[in-house]
């Protein structure tokens, strides 16, 4: 069963395989850049199959008037199962709360 969890801290080792699996070489060739990007994200949700991270959505922005989906990744073997949609739904809910609380 897949669960979606908001993560305050995401370790590089836990998610680097996602970027490798989908061929996002900018981060895989420069993992320190990904580590910095993760630590400066507004919100990160991960999709878990047990303890294994199989998907991720990363939001960036000022958290006041703008929030963007920077990364939405699901392992190829888990795609077409609604995981990306579930991650996006969580992101939309938190975005509504962030923007609403700022107005």
Locate each region found by the language model.
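Active-site rim helix/loop that mediates acceptor-substrate recognition in acyltransferases
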Residues: 24-44
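Conserved acetyl-CoA pyrophosphate-binding loop and the N-cap/start of the following alpha-helix
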Residues: 78, 82-87
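Conserved beta-hairpin
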Residues: 42-57
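A conserved beta-turn-beta hairpin within the catalytic core of GNAT-like acetyltransferases
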Residues: 61-69, 79
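Conserved GNAT acetyl-CoA-binding A-motif
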Residues: 88, 94-103
């Amino acid at each position: 069963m897949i669960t979606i969890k908001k993560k305050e801290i995401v370790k590089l080792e836990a998610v680097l395989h996602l970027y490798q699996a989908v061929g996002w070489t900018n981060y895989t060739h420069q993992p320190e850049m990904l580590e910095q990007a993760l630590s400066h994200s507004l919100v990160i949700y991960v999709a878990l199959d047990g303890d294994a991270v199989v998907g991720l959505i990363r939001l960036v922005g000022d958290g006041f008037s703008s929030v963007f989906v920077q990364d939405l990744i699901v392992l190829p073997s888990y795609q077409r199962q609604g995981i990306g949609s579930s991650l996006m739904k969580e992101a939309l809910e938190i975005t509504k709360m962030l923007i609403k609380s700022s107005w």
